[in-house]
């Protein structure tokens, strides 16, 4: 009894909520064996036939290719595509592909040569001696993807499963009406399918392997049981026919009773699912060394004279397959890629067969029925009762129609598997799946835009942070440079510290003065004189710096000198015409003489700092020196011939002496700055200087006599 209960629990199956039972219409195509289709003249191979980015091209126009030769390189999640036959690459250009909107994707166009030559094939019959990583890499590089309709790269899926997979499920349900590709494949190639399952099991090492198949496929069930007769590691589970029991989440629940969490994957609960066609492709890739270049496609519908299942090369135009099956189109003929519930209408018949193409349905007008007009939702809740994902399709319909993306996301529109059960039972003929597909596409576009905005914001904030760091570092460097004293300041600080230490040392030593002697203040006096000399030197340095910063214009200096000479002549005339009884204040005369000397010194300094390119003409300087000497002689004669009682004005004498000294200094500087080839006679200059000194001495003596 215990064994009976254990066996019952082991073979237990669960049932999911919702689902429908549409007419199966499978007998049109599942009664004939698989057959080959003649090669087309031209093949169009899209670079992207899977979920993920397209691979990198490794062929160019004009190249000769063989069947199975890679057309792209598969790196990361990029899955390569291979040439379906031998021929020549005639173009690499965008071409409309299997998409409801007939979007153009980059494709390789090959003209077949009719020979259908393979590349050298290297099969791994002893695959059990290979490592897990080698097998996964081979499956990936041979272009194997999920052939059940999703198109997810099989190698990536196996790699992501890792060691946490406890249950491997092989999906053989094939629940959608009209489609019999997997059914016929299991009938004709059951042994190869089981061998592919064993390869997957060798890679994943699961605890149990389950094959889920609906009870409407008796021939396939018989063939699998015959192959698995001596196997105890693979369990065949026959489940009731119900749509959509072939969905990944639905079949997982039917066989294990586990539900995939919202927003999660089946691997999160230790389950990995593969399609029957995928298992067969894995066997051919690993054991036979053949990349995926063809797949089983169901050709069905009353508009096809010879329905059945064929081996269709990837890239074959749909028109070629239909014509080979006796396609008899009617007016406004519709061709559906996929099933009647989850498929889509082809915009034209030149689109190619890709890896996810499992059925081409060409229904007649009787099968389609009269077109029904879309009406308003009556909120009957029939769609909610039929939904296998436990969603509220009527609410999602209103949210999708009203562009309420947040509410649609809150109501888990992402969990919709687009099975079409809600649209099938809707009495108002509302194409709910179309609304849901459009809404999910808009939400995906919004999220992509938000992602780009977030990345742009992150880049901007990183840039701002970098600028702030650079600014802070720059301010810190400036602050450190400002705090650090300069070399001159260091010397001054060191000298001050030395003086302080010296004073402290002197203060600690007692000063002893003997009786009758004066204290020795020579050190203090010398220090005071040194400080005064240092102050004068600093003052002179500062004055030179200021004068160098504001160099006087030589022409302006000459004008000022002329004005000074004019003022001196005017002063002489006024003094000569003054009344004899008017007495001049000697202190005022001394002040004026000092002012004249200061102006003369300033004039000398400005001339010394004048620009070198504006040198004074040495001939002009010599003329002025001669004029000065003549004036000095004339002054001597006047003084000698003057009457004894005539009193000489001391102010005039002082001014003349100052002017004479200024002229003498100016003459010396002009001679020093003159060009080498125009040097003035040094003897003449010495004579002029001596005359000037004599005149100054005479003026001083005369001043003393007058004061007496």
Curated annotation (Swiss-Prot):
Biological function: Part of a membrane-bound complex that couples electron transfer with translocation of ions across the membrane. Required to maintain the reduced state of SoxR.
Organism: Escherichia coli O45:K1 (strain S88 / ExPEC)
A GO cellular component annotation in the UniProt record: plasma membrane
Annotated membrane topology: Peripheral membrane protein
Compartments where found: Cell inner membrane
Main location: membrane
E.C. no: 7.-.-.-
Annotated segments matching region Disordered: 630-682
Protein name: Ion-translocating oxidoreductase complex subunit C
Gene: rsxC
Entry-linked Gene3D superfamilies: 3.30.70.20, NADH-ubiquinone oxidoreductase 51kDa subunit
A single MF term (Gene Ontology): 4 iron, 4 sulfur cluster binding
């Amino acid at each position: 009894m215990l064994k009976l209960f254990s066996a019952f629990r082991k073979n237990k199956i669960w049932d999911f909520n919702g689902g429908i039972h549409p007419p199966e219409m499978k007998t049109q195509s599942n009664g004939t064996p698989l057959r080959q289709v003649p090669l087309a003249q031209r093949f169009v191979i899209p670079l992207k036939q899977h979920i993920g980015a397209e691979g990198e091209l490794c062929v160019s126009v004009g190249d000769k290719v063989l069947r199975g030769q890679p057309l792209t390189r598969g790196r990361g999640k990029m899955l390569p595509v291979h040439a379906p036959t031998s021929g020549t690459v005639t173009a690499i250009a965008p071409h409309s592909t299997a998409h409801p909107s007939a979007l153009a994707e980059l494709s390789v166009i090959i003209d077949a040569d009719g020979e259908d030559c393979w590349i050298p094939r290297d099969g791994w019959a002893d695959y059990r001696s290979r490592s897990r990583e080698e097998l996964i890499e081979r499956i990936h590089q041979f272009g194997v993807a999920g052939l059940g309709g999703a198109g997810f790269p099989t190698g990536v899926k196996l790699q992501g499963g890792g060691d946490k997979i406890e249950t491997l499920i092989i999906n053989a349900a094939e629940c959608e009406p009209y489609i019999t590709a997997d059914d016929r494949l299991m009938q004709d190639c059951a042994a190869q399918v089981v061998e592919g399952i064993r390869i997957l099991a060798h890679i994943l090492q699961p605890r149990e392997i389950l094959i889920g198949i609906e009870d409407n496929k008796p021939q396939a069930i018989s063939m699998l049981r015959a192959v698995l007769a001596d196997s105890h590691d693979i369990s065949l589970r026959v489940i009731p026919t119900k749509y959509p029991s072939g969905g990944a989440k639905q079949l997982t629940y039917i066989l294990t009773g586990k539900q995939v969490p919202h927003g999660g994957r089946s691997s999160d609960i230790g389950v990995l699912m593969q399609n029957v066609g995928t298992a067969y492709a894995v066997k051919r890739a690993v054991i036979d060394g053949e990349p995926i270049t063809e797949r089983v496609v169901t050709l069905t519908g009353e508009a096809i004279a010879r329905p059945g299942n064929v081996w269709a090369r990837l890239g074959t135009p749909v028109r070629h397959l239909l014509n080979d099956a006796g396609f008899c189109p009617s007016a406004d003929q519709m061709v559906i890629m996929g099933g009647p519930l989850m498929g889509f209408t082809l915009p034209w018949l030149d689109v190619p067969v890709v890896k996810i193409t499992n059925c081409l349905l060409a229904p007649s007008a009787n099968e389609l029925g009269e077109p029904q007009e879309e009406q308003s939702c009556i909120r009957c809740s029939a769609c909610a009762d039929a939904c296998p994902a436990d969603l509220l399709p009527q609410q999602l319909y209103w949210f999708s129609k009203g562009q309420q993306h947040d509410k649609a996301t809150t109501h888990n529109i992402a969990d919709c598997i687009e099975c079409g059960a809600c649209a099938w039972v809707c009495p108002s003929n509302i194409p709910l799946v179309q609304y849901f597909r459009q809404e999910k596409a808009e939400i995906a576009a919004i999220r992509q835009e938000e992602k780009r905005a977030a990345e742009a914001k992150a880049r901007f904030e990183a840039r701002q942070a970098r600028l702030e760091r650079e600014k802070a570092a720059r301010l810190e460097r400036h602050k450190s440079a400002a705090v650090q004293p300069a070399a001159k300041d260091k010397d001054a600080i060191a000298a001050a510290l030395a003086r302080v230490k010296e004073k402290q040392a002197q203060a600690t030593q007692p000063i002893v003065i003997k009786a009758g002697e004066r204290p020795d203040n020579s050190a203090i006096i010398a220090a005071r004189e040194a400080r005064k000399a240092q102050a004068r030197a600093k003052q002179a340095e500062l004055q030179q710096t200021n004068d160098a910063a504001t160099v006087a214009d030589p022409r302006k200096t000459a004008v000022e000198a002329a004005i000074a000479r004019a003022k001196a002549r005017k002063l002489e005339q006024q003094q000569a015409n003054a009344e004899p009884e008017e007495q001049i204040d000697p202190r005022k005369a001394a002040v004026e003489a000092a002012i004249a000397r200061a102006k003369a010194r300033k004039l000398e300094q400005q001339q010394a700092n004048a620009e070198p390119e504006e040198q004074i003409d040495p001939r002009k300087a010599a003329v002025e020196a001669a004029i000065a000497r003549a004036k000095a002689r004339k002054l001597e004669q006047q003084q000698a011939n003057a009457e004894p009682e005539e009193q000489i004005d001391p102010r005039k004498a002082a001014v003349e002496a100052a002017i004479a000294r200024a002229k003498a200094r100016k003459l010396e500087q002009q001679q020093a700055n003159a060009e080498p080839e125009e040097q003035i006679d040094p003897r003449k200059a010495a004579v002029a200087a001596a005359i000037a000194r004599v005149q100054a001495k005479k003026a001083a003596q005369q001043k003393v006599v007058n004061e007496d």
